[in-house]
Amino acid sequence: VLTHAHEDHIGAIAHLWPKLQCKIYATPFTAVLIKEKFKEKHIDITKDLQIVELNGNISLEKFEIEYITLTHSILEPNGLRIKTPAGVILHTGDWKVDPNPLIGDEINSKRLKEIGDEGVLAMICDSTNVFSAGRSGSELDVRKNLLNIVNRLKKRVIITSFASNVARMETAFYCAEKSGRQISLVGRSMHRIYTCLLYTSDAADDVIS
């Protein structure tokens, strides 16, 4: 059961699956990326890849699992409410509370509050930057600052980023459009992510390979 498509969560799946031969559950964008990984291994995963709708539910024997939409730097990050015979477990996956998400849906804070009110036996939580005080900045702030920089520059602009940081990729597309530039993606992972975006969202179509 996959929460989102970052490499540290799905990178080993095509290597492990031949030994496990199990069903894989994922939301649409994550599922498209997984298919691409299995294609590289010449494995047809179609019949074992189960696509779960956003905020959807699945049943696995004694476990009832509910997907909860969160916000992060990639499309379709999900938390999991796992109902077990012993009680409810909340697995957050990776998340970042962004009041102005530039990609995907807003965090389903209403459902998270309901789950908290209902009672949770244990929460398994992403802890990146847990020792940093204050709030994380919004990608909207990055977009504004980056656009100001790009507008001041007259020649080629090179932007580095993790390929799976879809929010940053979208910011780069936005800045290119507003400044009258074209985008050239460099790297196999960048092209893979972009191709998957074309299948599942309204990604920019003015990219130079």
Regions found by a protein language model. Give the residues of each.
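Single conserved hydrophobic/aromatic residue that forms the stacking wall/gate
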Residues: Y199-I208
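Conserved P-loop/Walker A NTP-binding site and adjacent catalytic elements of P-loop NTPases
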Residues: T27, I34-K37
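A short acidic, amphipathic alpha-helical/loop segment
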Residues: A12-K19, N78, T171-C175
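Core dinuclear metal-dependent hydrolase active-site scaffold
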Residues: E53-L112, G116, E177-S179, S209
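Cap/insert and terminal regions of metallo-dependent hydrolase folds
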Residues: F29, P99-R188
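Active-site metal-binding motif and surrounding structural segment of the metallo-beta-lactamase
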Residues: V1-A26, E114-M123
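Divalent metal-coordination and catalytic microenvironments
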Residues: H4-A5, I65, H72, D94, ...
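Catalytic metal-binding/acid-base residues of hydrolase active sites
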Residues: H6, K96, T128
